[in-house]
């Protein structure tokens, strides 16, 4: 979805200010750069600048993208170490009981699991 991170971060920033949160975390990562300009490091730098002038000066909110410089296989490996239940995650752009296996997101996910040397639990249902 074009501009999705602009939308997500804008809502998150508004809510964070209301509830006085100290940080917002977003899971954007390196492989998304090609199709989504709002996944690039330059976008996050610009959004952080905008946030500093767009919210109350007394309330500073950090915007953190800890996966930004990682690829899918690195994220999947990290998730495995952390016990992420990948069978409950969804990457496919289409609705259904099982991922389509054809969209870009499914291809990136399959490649990530393969490069990490792991089996995707969603594809083995």
Where are these regions (language model features)?
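Nucleotide-activated chemistry modules centered on ATP-dependent adenylation/adenylyltransferase
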Residues: 1-125
